[in-house]
Amino acid sequence: MIEENVKKFNQIIDDLLERSKNTYVYDPDIYKDIRNAQIFLVKFAQSDINPECIDILHKAFQTLSDAYYVVRWYVKQDKRHVVRVLKEKFNTAKDLVSGINSEICGE
């Protein structure tokens, strides 16, 4: 179950990365999908995992919050800045969650 959730989350992030791969263009409505990724993390954290893994998921959630607010604050600003920050935040969240497995989190 844990590995399945990690795989699903990675797919969500890969989709977000794909949507922001062009340096000058991103969909301003991407914030909705960032929120959906956060909701997925909350549901993941509510599954039967230990507190250490919940902390990791919380860090990933916070990272996505940063991405969300960058989109909301800078929607009319330099798109290169927004895309660069989005890529960084998405990759950081993916790296955090990718380190989770059944052995570490217990199931």
Swiss-Prot record:
Name of the molecule in the record: Uncharacterized protein ORF107a
Source taxon at top rank: Viruses
Organism of derivation: Acidianus bottle-shaped virus (isolate Italy/Pozzuoli)
